[in-house]
């Protein structure tokens, strides 16, 4: 069996660990961003009503 070396130089276990940390941090980032957008929408909706923002 010929062992193929990775292009990045990290092992498969290290790659899986990195992937787990990366995906969880992306989910946290998107969660914070979605919450911030919700707060801004509550404060001032992007589509004003018939009377504008008054």
From Swiss-Prot:
<keyword id="KW-0812">Transmembrane</keyword>
<dbReference type="InterPro" id="IPR023623">
    <property type="entry name" value="Antenna_beta_CS"/>
</dbReference>
<comment type="subunit">
    <text>The core complex is formed by different alpha and beta chains, binding bacteriochlorophyll molecules, and arranged most probably in tetrameric structures disposed around the reaction center. The non-pigmented gamma chains may constitute additional components.</text>
</comment>
<feature type="topological domain" description="Cytoplasmic">
    <location>
        <begin position="1"/>
        <end position="20"/>
    </location>
</feature>
<dbReference type="InterPro" id="IPR000066">
    <property type="entry name" value="Antenna_a/b"/>
</dbReference>
<dbReference type="GO" id="GO:0019684">
    <property type="term" value="P:photosynthesis, light reaction"/>
</dbReference>
<dbReference type="InterPro" id="IPR002362">
    <property type="entry name" value="LHB-1/5"/>
</dbReference>
<keyword id="KW-0157">Chromophore</keyword>
<comment type="similarity">
    <text>Belongs to the antenna complex beta subunit family.</text>
</comment>
<feature type="topological domain" description="Periplasmic">
    <location>
        <begin position="44"/>
        <end position="54"/>
    </location>
</feature>
<keyword id="KW-0042">Antenna complex</keyword>
<keyword id="KW-0148">Chlorophyll</keyword>
<keyword id="KW-0479">Metal-binding</keyword>
<keyword id="KW-1003">Cell membrane</keyword>
<keyword id="KW-1133">Transmembrane helix</keyword>
<dbReference type="GO" id="GO:0042314">
    <property type="term" value="F:bacteriochlorophyll binding"/>
</dbReference>
<keyword id="KW-0472">Membrane</keyword>
<protein>
    <recommendedName>
        <fullName>Light-harvesting protein B-870 beta chain</fullName>
    </recommendedName>
</protein>
<dbReference type="GO" id="GO:0030077">
    <property type="term" value="C:plasma membrane light-harvesting complex"/>
</dbReference>
<feature type="binding site" description="axial binding residue">
    <location>
        <position position="19"/>
    </location>
    <ligand>
        <name>a bacteriochlorophyll</name>
    </ligand>
</feature>
<dbReference type="InterPro" id="IPR035889">
    <property type="entry name" value="Light-harvesting_complex"/>
</dbReference>
<keyword id="KW-0076">Bacteriochlorophyll</keyword>
<keyword id="KW-0437">Light-harvesting polypeptide</keyword>
<dbReference type="Pfam" id="PF00556">
    <property type="entry name" value="LHC"/>
</dbReference>
<comment type="function">
    <text>Antenna complexes are light-harvesting systems, which transfer the excitation energy to the reaction centers.</text>
</comment>
<dbReference type="InterPro" id="IPR023624">
    <property type="entry name" value="Antenna_beta_dom_sf"/>
</dbReference>
<feature type="transmembrane region" description="Helical">
    <location>
        <begin position="21"/>
        <end position="43"/>
    </location>
</feature>
<dbReference type="GO" id="GO:0045156">
    <property type="term" value="F:electron transporter, transferring electrons within the cyclic electron transport pathway of photosynthesis activity"/>
</dbReference>
<dbReference type="GO" id="GO:0005886">
    <property type="term" value="C:plasma membrane"/>
</dbReference>
<keyword id="KW-0460">Magnesium</keyword>
<feature type="binding site" description="axial binding residue">
    <location>
        <position position="37"/>
    </location>
    <ligand>
        <name>a bacteriochlorophyll</name>
    </ligand>
</feature>
<dbReference type="GO" id="GO:0046872">
    <property type="term" value="F:metal ion binding"/>
</dbReference>
<keyword id="KW-0997">Cell inner membrane</keyword>
């Amino acid at each position: 069996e010929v062992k193929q070396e990775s292009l990045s130089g990290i092992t498969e276990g290290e790659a899986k660990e990195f992937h787990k940390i990366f995906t969880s941090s992306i989910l946290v980032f998107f969660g914070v961003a979605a919450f911030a957008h919700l707060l801004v929408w509550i404060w001032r909706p992007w589509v004003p009503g018939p009377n504008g923002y008054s």
